[in-house]
Amino acid sequence: MTARGRRQELALRIVVPEAGWVQVRPVVDGRDILAEPPAGWSGEDPWVVLGPGGLAAVDEHPHEVRLARISCTEVCCGALYVTVRREGDEVVWDGWRNPAGGSADLPEFRFEAARYEAEVHRAALDRGWEWPARTVAGLLAERLRADADWSRRWECELEAVWTSPDEPERLELVLIHPDLRAEQDGRPWLQLGVALDAGDGDPAAEAQRLAARLAGGDRQEMAEVWGRSWHYAEDFA
């Protein structure tokens, strides 16, 4: 127990829908908290929630984690952020925010730190749901984010690599031109998409092959415009 009230219990459920992205559904005291905001929310991808900078990166310095989104870019369609921090032997979730200005009215949650860390660790290690192209997508994302030359040459930053169970061999790269902060800073931006097919070989070798293809490829030939800020009236060239 704490001076501010009862501690909650956290469970992180990985949901693989028939179509769409894999979701992490945070369940607090048996209640799916993403079912409470307006209809249409989907849990965020495990790479975002459980990866670097996600729920496991907890100390006394608060940081935001995106727990849910709808689709497209978050300023357009909305997303759900929570601020995560450590207070003594507790982990606190509060400061809920929706960049699109919609509802983000959720209460503060407090978890016992040891139990919280154990649950996040368990969920991060659970890969039983993953299919081969999903593994390739994760490895490819790591390579591209570490390749500053590719990002500079393409004048883009990688937002995500999508793959879905209904098209298990297809990868879709989501890129933002000129960079990921453009939308937040109010600068012109474009969302670009690149479709790739993953082979059935070793995932690490497939990721290397696709990264090499992108490194030697031309953005104008490989990418399509998927979305844009109001600043752009015509297709990006």
Regions found by a protein language model. Give the residues of each.
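Charged, amphipathic alpha-helical segments
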Residues: 1-13, 49-52, 139-162
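N-terminal "first-domain core" detector
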Residues: 1-48
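Amphipathic, interaction-prone secondary-structure segments
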Residues: 19-20, 43, 51-83, 148-188
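Short amphipathic beta-strand/extended segments with alternating polar/hydrophobic composition
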Residues: 31-41, 101-112, 182-198
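Short hydrophobic/aromatic-rich beta-strand segments that constitute the beta-sheet cores
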Residues: 91-95
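Surface-exposed beta-loop interaction hotspot
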Residues: 96-151
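Preference for solvent-exposed, low-hydrophobicity sequence contexts
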Residues: 154-237
